[in-house]
């Protein structure tokens, strides 16, 4: 099922300089030279059906130096989530046309699992729109439920945006869960909020809770937003084109540029002209922007008739959110079309790929319960550097100055094999019915698909030659 509501978000920050002592360069050190204070945020609330809930773009820029932008972001986001829940908390009755009725009567396969239908055939419909979706097994229909979470997607949430507002999640009631990558970075974190209350049959008040799940699009597409945007066709920018058109749209069909290091305090917002090209220098990357990028920024300022840097700031963050929405919505469409899976249900690409593999191959993996079997398989796992090197080679070919036509023609070719793990995983792999072999089967092991643990007789004269890597795995 496509997750009905998804939020795409982004923050921008002032980069305040920090006065500090020079570090001892004879030792390893981390130098803090900037403090990032949020200057504004923007998010797009995207529904799977624009007719019942048109896209909602929310943007807030700091208006006073002491405003708490992260707190405003959290409070406003929670209020919109509560509003969405209460608008759609009651299931819509199914709307069946004559065509839908005929389709349901003649259906022979479940539209969810694609399996053959029997006596448990039921009608499946969308509880938000009331539209008929197809015939399904009763069990499939019961599991095909609207999720109890709302994904909020940032690009590079783990590395940047999460540090700006995660503390503010604790200022309101609700449990917070996280999936940590390490002490500083999180794969995802979730804030539970109360969206409604009702009185049960015993007369006791009951709270209805939903999760706001923050996930990182970088965990699915590990490239810069600029790179991801460049891979899309013009027709793919449906969210951007719903807000801009003509020359303005053409200017925004790429990632913009922003003078991060120059943008150091609240007063920069009231600047009445674009800063010079030198102001776009990045201390972090030690790079300047190109002349082409600066001309693009100047044209954006002119075409959008900007008066202050606040206008430029607002457009920059807004376009980033719309571009992210278009990139991830296209990614969702591709995954749904090819695998029938929505990435918005997942935390990372490996989790999505794992479910896609199980679904496409229809393999049921057997759980190993024999400890000895598990240990034996673990012993056979090898990894690390994989290479085959020739210590000495002499070429002889027409492209060489010292080519000898009387000798065999020889070339020295460097081969680089990529994705060895992926290649191995695409080969036939054991999945089930694991058992120990009998003595008779071991004698004729070549006739059975098997994993062998053996003792090797390794002549001493081969030890140095096969030192790295050894011919067989060492138990």
Task: Give the location of each predicted region.
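Metal-dependent nucleotidyl/phosphoryl-transfer cores and adjacent nucleic-acid-binding surfaces
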Residues: 1-475
């Amino acid at each position: 099922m496509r997750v009905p509501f998804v939020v795409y978000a982004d923050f921008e920050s002032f980069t305040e300089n920090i006065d500090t002592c020079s570090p001892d360069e004879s030792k390893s050190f981390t130098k803090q030279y900037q403090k990032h204070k949020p200057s504004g945020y923007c998010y797009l609330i995207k529904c799977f059906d624009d007719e019942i809930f048109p896209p909602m773009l929310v943007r807030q820029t700091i208006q006073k130096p002491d405003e708490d932008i992260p707190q405003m972001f959290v409070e406003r986001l929670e209020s919109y989530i509560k509003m969405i829940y209460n608008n759609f908390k009651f299931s819509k009755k199914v709307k069946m046309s004559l065509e839908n009725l005929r389709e349901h009567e003649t259906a022979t396969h479940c539209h969810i699992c694609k399996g053959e239908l029997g006596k448990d055939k039921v009608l499946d419909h969308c509880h938000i729109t009331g539209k008929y979706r197809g015939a399904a097994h009763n069990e499939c229909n019961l599991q095909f439920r609207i999720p109890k979470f709302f994904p909020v997607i940032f690009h590079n949430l783990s590395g940047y945006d999460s540090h700006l507002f995660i503390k503010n999640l604790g200022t309101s009631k609700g449990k917070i869960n996280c999936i940590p990558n390490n002490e500083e970075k999180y794969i995802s974190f979730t804030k539970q909020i109360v969206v409604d209350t009702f009185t049960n049959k015993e007369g006791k008040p009951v709270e209805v809770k939903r999760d706001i799940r923050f996930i990182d699009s970088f965990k699915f597409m590990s490239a810069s937003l600029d790179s991801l945007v460049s891979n899309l066709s013009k027709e793919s920018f449906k969210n951007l084109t719903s807000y801009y058109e003509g020359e303005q749209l053409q200017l925004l069909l790429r990632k913009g540029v922003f003078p991060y290091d120059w943008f150091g305090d609240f007063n920069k917002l009231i600047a009445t002209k674009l800063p010079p090209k030198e102001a776009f220098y990045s201390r972090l990357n030690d790079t300047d922007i190109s002349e082409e990028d600066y001309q693009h920024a100047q044209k954006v300022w002119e075409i959008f008739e900007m008066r202050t840097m606040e206008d430029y700031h607002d457009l920059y963050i807004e376009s980033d959110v719309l571009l992210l929405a278009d990139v991830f919505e296209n990614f969702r469409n591709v995954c749904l079309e090819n695998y029938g899976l929505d990435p918005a249900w997942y935390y990372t690409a490996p989790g999505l790929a794992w479910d896609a593999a199980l679904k496409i191959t229809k393999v049921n993996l057997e759980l190993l319960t024999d400890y000895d079997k598990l240990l034996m398989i673990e012993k056979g796992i090898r990894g690390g550097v994989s290479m085959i090197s020739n210590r000495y080679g002499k070429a002889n070919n027409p492209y060489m100055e010292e080519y000898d036509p009387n000798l065999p023609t020889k070339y020295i070719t460097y081969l680089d094999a990529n994705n060895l793990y992926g290649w191995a995983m695409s080969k036939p792999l054991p999945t089930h019915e694991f058992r120990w072999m009998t003595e008779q089967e071991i004698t004729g092991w070549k006739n059975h698909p098997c994993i062998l643990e053996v003792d090797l007789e390794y002549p001493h004269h081969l030890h140095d030659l096969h030192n790295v890597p050894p011919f067989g795995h060492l138990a």
